[in-house]
Every structure is written in C-alpha cells, then in structure tokens.
Swiss-Prot record:
Matching InterPro entries: Ser_deHydtase-like_asu, UPF0597
Any GO MF annotation of the entry: L-cysteine desulfhydrase activity
Family according to the record: Belongs to the UPF0597 family.
Name assigned to this protein: UPF0597 protein YhaM
Amino acid sequence: MFESKINPLWQSFILAVQEEVKPALGCTEPISLALAAAAAAAELDGTVERIDAWVSPNLMKNGMGVTVPGTGMVGLPIAAALGVLGGDAKAGLEVLKDASAKAVADAKAMLAAGHVAVMLQEPCNDILFSRAKVYSGDSWACVTIVGDHTNIVRIETDKGVVFTQADNAQEEEKTSPLGVLSHTSLEEILAFVNAVPFDAIRFILDAARLNGALSQEGLRGSWGLHIGSTLAKQCDRGLLAKDLSTAILIRTSAASDARMGGATLPAMSNSGSGNQGITATVPVMVVAEHVGADDERLARALMLSHLSAIYIHHQLPRLSALCAATTAAMGAAAGMAWLIDGRYDTIAMAISSMIGDVSGMICDGASNSCAMKVSTSASAAWKAVLMALDDTAVTGNEGIVAHNVEQSIANLCSLACRSMQQTDKQIIEIMASKAH
C-alpha cells in the first residue's frame, strides 16, 4: 500500500535496517561458532562425538570471556557443544533459543570429557571466521562461516562438498542494500526518517520491545556486573540523582548487564552486535518516554538511531579494536536529538561532540565489562545532545573532528581501519597470555 510512496533509496534504507537489525540470543561471536556447529551437526545422522573448531583472532577475542545464555559458562567451547547438541541451524543468531536443560547438561559433559577443541585459524585473513568440524563414528561434517556472523560459505562432509558460496563479493556489495550507504549522507537519512510512511518502518518498534525487556531483566536480576541495578540502588541512597540522564544510564546499562551475563532473552542487534543494538535503542526509548512520544515518533527516532549507527559502522571493519558501542551511541545521539529538536544541525553537532569525546575506546573482547562501555557511550551521547541543544559542540579546530560531520566520521573510521590494527593485535596477545 505504501510501496508506491517509497523511492528506491528509501527502500534500500529499509532493507539495510532489516538486514542489520535482527534478534540475537547471546553474544554474536560465540553464537556464530554455535551456528557453524549446529549446521555441521545437521549434516550427520548419528550422534556427534567430537568437535574441532577454528576461529579468527578477532572472534577468539570476543568469545573468550562472555557467558553463553542458559549455561552459566563462558567461552567458545560451550557455545560449539551446545550448538551441536541443542542448536537450531535454521534460526540464525537465535540458534540456541530452544536449547533444553538436557542439551546444556550434555554439552557440559562433552566439554568435561575433552571432546571439544577450539583453535586459532592460522593464517587467517578474515576478521570474522568460524569453522566447526563434527564427528560421528567414521562420518564428519564441516561448516565454515566468513565475513558475517551467519554467512555460511562452505558445507562439506566425508562424502564431498555439499555447498559452496560463489566468490562474487564485489558484485554483491554493489547490489546489497548496505552498498548504498557508501554513497549517501546523514542529511539523506534524516530526510528519509522525516517523510517515510510510518507503516514502512513500524517494524523497528520490535527493537524497543526486545531491548526494553532485556533492560527490565537487568534491573530485576543480578546479571553480569549488575551496573544498572547497582546504580539504581545508589539513587535510592541519595548518591545519584533521579533524573533523565540517570535513567538513560541505568536502563541502558541494565540491558547490557543482562545481555552479557547470559540472560535467555534475545537482544535486537545492530551490525551483528547485541550491545550495539541496545545502545542504539534504549537511550532513545527513555527520551521518547520523557517527551511523551507516540509510537510513530518513537519509530522514526529509532529508525534514525539504528540507520545512523549502521551508516557509521559500515565504514568500519566488522570487528576491530574500536569499541563499536561508541558508534552505536552516535546513532542514539541522533535519535535523542531528533526527539527534542529535530534539526539536522543539532544532530550533526551531537555526533561531532561524540567523536571528540569517546573516540579510541578499545574493544578488548566481549565480556561483562562491555556494559561499562555501553553505559559510558550512552551517557556521552546524552551529554553531546545537551550541548548541541545549546549550539555547543566540539569544533573542527580540535583533534580529529572536522568542520563537517561526514568528514569527522570518516576520520574516526580511518583510525579503526588503519592505525588501530596493531592495537588489535596487541589486545589479542595480552588476552591470549591471560588464558595460559
């Protein structure tokens, strides 16, 4: 009904959000390996007795210290075992959503028996790479995921190759809805958000539903570092003000607490990350409630936040040494500024101030401490919005911030793409030394 009102660019924007904003149960790096393992197990008729897995250094970094939902355990081995014994290979990032208590117990027993090995893929030119090879008697199956958390590129068994993805990545990039982001701007994204029919973007309200539920769970339970619930107690003790800034901080932190602590609730992810999805969603929800926004205004603000976050992250490697909660929070700054002011200049100033503030925050792997970085990023976003509302921002005379927001974004992303590669290697070396 509304398709006739939507031009091709807007359709690409909607498809890009639908492609990058998806439900995900558990941190997406171990979940990627769980999916590879589940897909491999689906190729065998017998019971899987052993698992060998190989992952890229970046995937190892993000899988070493994070809790796998429903298991109470951290790390890639339990993710691989549970993927085999309780995973649904057709469920993508929700591969473990139906894993039973028996499957969890069996997975732990498989680990205890020493039947799961996870190794670094060396050499590895792919930032995101996971391969699982599973064995049942004399039979085996192997599944490889490359480039994206759910992008299966090869399925092979002892009987031969079952599936291989054609190597046409450059052509796909040209036709992919994400490809259009290389040739657009924040101004075009804002024009889309202001004018697109509500029914075409109503689906983004699911992000508020899922990530709002995670936030509530984080405040109820003692998940992860329980930053959200701890700060809520400090409000009750009079050590922290009960105001909008604090509500943004507490509710966003709580969602990440639950996410990283292993709550069995899905997050609505952004750019392959639950924490990025939380960061792009919850601050906007809190401000929307404060200003009394209806569903349509909330949907437009969330669409601006998520699409801006995708637009910025598309200029980054899929995984890098740069904490992408910071770039997701730039999207949140845009969404919050839009709810209060709506002007492009305010949005641009807020993002520029974010780049002048939290740039360079490192990603040292997925863990409970991600909630600290999520809370810092959300607070910085709101601070940047408050400054922008008074026409104050970090200017192009300072640091890596340029005189226009598009160049500021490009400057930030060039750091992650080039200069921070050695940083990433050093982080992985430090983390690997701790594991021994």
